[in-house]
Amino acid sequence: MRLSGNGLRCVRGGREVFSGLDVAAESGHAVAITGPNGAGKTSLLRLLAGLLAIADGSISLEGGDPELTLPEQAHYLGHRDALKPALTVSENLSFWRDFLGGGKSGESDALAAVGLDHVAHLPAAYLSAGQRRRLSIARLLAVKRPVWLLDEPTSALDVTGQAAFAAIMTGHLAGGGIILAATHTPLGIAARELRIGGAA
């Protein structure tokens, strides 16, 4: 499987964020997208996820499911945790599993993998910032998709949480997955760097 973007141009609010940008990643490989604030790291991920319109260029996924679009084969994990405070940990994960079209199995395993199985009954409002991030990460495991597009995925995670997530990412890559992550800090896994320039 190969994900590629060629000659990408992004315009937001009438301002050109970047142009002529090429990006590529193959099965079993990760790309760390780096650069100053405002350079377009998040915008690139959102283009790949189909959440922003491409001003110019092309995006393709070779070797994926031909009956599904790239967004249908990708997880986009934004820098904000999309959780409902009144719902329990388990209910939040169930919501995302249903929304993303996942099966009924795997939820308990996903919570255990991120260390939240013991608080599955608690409302998300009671979680710490790190626990909220781990719950967001559980979505990646509850619904299997080959491409992970991650925006500052280790934000709010402590050292233990970062190590656990590195192991999760390593497992995803070992299974033939692809990871592109916008980050200011090391991911804890082998990754090729794609640096985007631009003013902060």
UniProtKB/Swiss-Prot annotation:
Enumerate the spans annotated as ABC transporter domain: 1-200
Signal peptide positions are none
- Nucleotide-binding keyword on record: yes
Q: Where in the cell is it found?
A: Cell inner membrane
Keywords of the record: ATP-binding, Cell inner membrane, Cell membrane, Cytochrome c-type biogenesis, Membrane, Nucleotide-binding, Translocase, Transport
List, in alphabetical order, the Gene Ontology terms for molecular function in this entry: ABC-type heme transporter activity; ATP binding; ATP hydrolysis activity
Mention one GO biological process in which this protein takes part, according to its record: cytochrome complex assembly
Q: Which family does it belong to?
A: Belongs to the ABC transporter superfamily. CcmA exporter (TC 3.A.1.107) family.
UniProt-recorded name of the protein: Cytochrome c biogenesis ATP-binding export protein CcmA
Organism from which the protein derives? Nitrobacter winogradskyi (strain ATCC 25391 / DSM 10237 / CIP 104748 / NCIMB 11846 / Nb-255)
> Which gene specifies this protein's sequence?
ccmA
